[in-house]
Amino acid sequence: MFTMNRIRSFKAGHWIIIGAVIIVILIVAVVANQYNDSTTSKSKRSVISTADSFQYKCKSDAESLLCMEQQYKTFTKNHGVPTAFTKLKAAYAIDPSVKTYCHQLSHVIGRTEADMVKNVDEAYSKGDNFCWSGYYHGVMESIVVKIGAKNLPAKLPTICAAIKAQKPYSFYHYNCVHGLGHGVMDVTDSNLFASLKMCDLLSNAWEKESCYGGVFMENEMDEVNPDHHSNYLKADQPMYPCTVVEQQYKYQCYLMQTSHALRVANYDFAKVFTECSNIETNYIEVCYQSLGRDASGNSSSNVDKTKANCMLGANSDAQTNCIVGAVKDFVSYYHSDKQANDLCLSLDNSLQQICQTTKAQYYKTF
């Protein structure tokens, strides 16, 4: 059974766990919206077009992301970060295609701003956490690309030093070092193994783990982004590359991997529960928790659907850990404990206590 002592302490991994939930929500959001909302009706698009004069000149197909990215890049250059986020938030509320690619579009706003300023601090001062902190990840991508592959090994440990000094182990510190993971994937041409080794140059285990999470997340995003490709995800081996990476990378890998496993299993949660049960013993619980995050993310944190998918676990250990992952995702999705409480109250008594305890502890971090 799941026990609370398996949750990492704040200093050892507090924001790593938060980041794992938050960053992977975006993977689930992309997949869930592509799976459930592949098109937008003509009538709805007409209404949206009136609300936003530039956003919907893009086609509603795989090319739409590239088109929207260019629009937000230009808009951010011309009007600044706050106005770009105002536009993005309005579009997010009414169109599934924007919801699908919201994190990527936030990356674009961050990259664009970072290209125009001198350093991380200046770019971060204008940031917005909307859509799972994509802005900050985009900033770091730009910063790393500016430094370049040749100079990066020497400079990598110092890039987030100022933020670390101001707010050590904070969410901002986490976003900085997690964003480095995105950035090193950029400069290594999405070489996952080389990128993980680059993360090992950081100063402590917490920063390294946060960076690993960025690498594995970028690998997942390479699979769903139309202008990228991952060489490290296999349809016939749904838990690859977690099965082959070195031991220190496995936790972060399995914390991301069920999003890919669900895609190749056509969202058969029962099948992926079984796949989780067959991996290395030390990582079975985190795999179940990853499925809980996906159960929430695939349903936009709908109580009944999330509960139903978690109850597909074959035993109490699988179901309990799924609920742990799900309730964290509810808190992250809503930035509130109200909806998470609704999930907990919907459960049998045997699951309510761990759900409520996890919810309360996790909500304190926000």
Regions found by a protein language model. Name each.
Residues 17, 29-366:
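Non-catalytic tandem-repeat scaffold regions and their flanking low-complexity/translocation tails
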Residues 6-21:
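N-terminal Sec-pathway targeting helices
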